[in-house]
A protein has these predicted regions:
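Lectin-type carbohydrate-recognition ectodomains
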Residues: 47-223
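Short linear motifs centered on Gly/Pro in flexible linkers and helix caps
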Residues: 23, 30-31, 38, 69, ...
Length: 223
């Protein structure tokens, strides 16, 4: 027969064995984190807005009026809720002209706002007087529409519309190749303002690099 002391020792031994087994079991079922189970953020899974140039438009041919600047008021370049990607003035052999232009798609643009450059002399129809007009949508904005208008006081201005972006835009300054300045609208046919397919125009201005040449300075912007 076991004494009471021996019984107590046996109970403690059995209880110790049970505790050890319980600890070993639970330790083996704990999942430790490792590199293969941790999901790291990946740029490829983050959707960023982008522009894509995929719509070609034109303003339709209309009389170029012997090259007088005021005849540009017949042409309205309008991309509606998208940004303008490029534009150039085109002449035909019948004394007509039109603007060809591309509209972007995509992006994260909204809040259309109306702007103008303010009236200034039309210079008797000389194209170089357009250098007094700076079409500028400002930072984080895209140009969506513009047209030249005139009043009854021999003055011109650009009306234009801008779209603000919900995401920051990164811009670069561009300049067209200078072309000969004769004072006629036909001078603009050498001035091709064109951004990459993932960019939009945010500003442009006619300049005179020399007394007998013109060029456009403009900005191309993207996400």
């Amino acid at each position: 027969m076991m004494t009471s002391l021996q019984k107590k020792i046996l109970v403690l031994f059995i209880f110790s064995i049970i505790i050890i087994i319980w600890i070993l079991y639970n330790d083996s079922t704990i999942t430790q984190p490792n590199d293969s189970t941790i999901i790291q953020p990946n740029k490829s899974t983050i959707t960023q807005p982008i522009f894509a140039s995929n719509t070609t438009k034109n303003t339709g041919f209309n009389d170029r009026g012997g090259g007088n600047t005021i005849f540009l008021d017949r042409h309205n370049l309008n991309c509606d809720s998208n940004g303008i990607n490029s534009f150039i003035l085109v002449n035909d052999e019948k004394g007509n002209m039109r603007y060809d232009y591309n509209c972007s798609s995509g992006g994260n643009l909204q809040k259309l706002s109306d702007k103008d450059t303010g009236f200034n002399s039309d210079g008797g129809g000389n194209i170089i007087y357009l250098d007094r007009h700076n079409i500028d949508c400002g930072s984080n904005s895209a140009l969506a529409q513009f047209n030249l208008i005139r009043n009854n006081n021999n003055q011109l201005r650009y009306n234009y519309k801008c779209l603000s972006s919900n995401e920051p835009l990164y811009c670069r300054n561009m300049t067209t190749t200078p072309g000969k300045a004769t004072g006629k609208t036909s001078d603009l046919k050498t001035q091709n303002l064109s951004c990459n397919n993932d960019e939009v125009i945010s500003s442009f201005k006619l300049t005179r690099p020399t007394n007998d040449s013109i060029a456009y300075q403009y900005k191309c912007c993207k996400y």
